[in-house]
């Protein structure tokens, strides 16, 4: 297990070398030395993430994004949230949402379901050139964090509308319109006919969203984190994707292609954008 922790760290360390600037790589090296006992003891990188709570710039492809991590973590301190550098590792260094998609950019409209701090929304705006990114995130405290990210990167708020609701299907939305919103309503209210990309990380709510899958007819590409701990049977997701003409692949946390019920990430496309 100790060897697994070491292997995982050095794999992520290598990936971080492609996104961090020199001074932040040096800070990472220092944090590695200081936190190595905690890493080996816990087999987690949380201590590194906490040590790297500093304002920095991150590269993703040709894009350079301002990441005020220290400011974000101060906002989220009352919620006892995970240090935001962990999101940098997973989303930008590991490229967990786009690793198996080769998208033709710039994109038009992007839908970020489970938008959290808004770091994928920012990536879509700056690195993928999205015209509009609609976010859905029910936790209110992430709203100020996202506005901070937009301001730090000179992005207009009008390009990134956000719903502070749970995403669900139309039938659930009709029963509880104050707390839930459907993709169909988002498209109608935002005047969007089609999404170039949908990113989804909604902690088990995918079961309801895919129970009424007509929205897939208006989507080109999909990337999602799966939650088998919350959803007993994920196969309706793959069936719905195939019904609407998508090719898809699913992978475990280590990056091995596996069946959907054992997977953590799923990538789907009907624009021939999938890569193994």
Locate each region found by the language model.
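Phosphate/nucleotide-binding beta-alpha loop and adjacent structural elements of enzyme active sites
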Residues: 1-276
């Amino acid at each position: 297990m100790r060897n697994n922790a070491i292997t995982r760290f050095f794999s992520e360390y290598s990936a971080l070398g492609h996104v961090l600037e020199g001074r932040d790589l040096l800070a990472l090296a220092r944090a590695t030395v200081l936190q190595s006992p905690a890493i080996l003891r816990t087999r987690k990188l949380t201590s590194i993430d906490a040590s790297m709570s500093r304002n920095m710039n991150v590269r993703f492809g040709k894009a350079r994004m301002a990441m005020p991590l220290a400011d974000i973590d101060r906002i989220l301190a009352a919620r006892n949230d995970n240090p935001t550098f962990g999101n940098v590792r997973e989303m930008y260094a590991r490229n967990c949402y786009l690793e198996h998609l080769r998208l033709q950019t710039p994109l038009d409209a992007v839908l970020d379901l489970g938008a959290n701090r808004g770091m994928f929304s920012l990536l879509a705006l700056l690195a993928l050139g999205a015209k509009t990114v609609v976010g859905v995130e029910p936790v209110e405290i992430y709203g100020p964090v996202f506005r901070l990210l937009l301001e730090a990167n000179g992005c207009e708020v009008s390009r990134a509308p956000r719903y502070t609701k749970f995403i669900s299907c139309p039938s659930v939305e009709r029963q509880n319109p104050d707390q839930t919103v459907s993709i169909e309503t988002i498209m109608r209210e935002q005047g969007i006919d089609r999404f170039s990309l949908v990113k989804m990380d909604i902690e088990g709510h995918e079961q309801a969203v895919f129970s009424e899958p007509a929205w897939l007819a208006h989507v080109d590409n999909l990337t999602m984190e799966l939650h088998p701990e919350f959803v007993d049977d994920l196969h309706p997701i793959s069936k719905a994707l195939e019904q609407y003409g998508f090719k898809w692949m699913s992978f475990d946390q280590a990056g091995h292609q596996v069946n959907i019920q054992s997977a953590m990430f799923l990538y789907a496309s009907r624009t021939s954008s999938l890569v193994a």
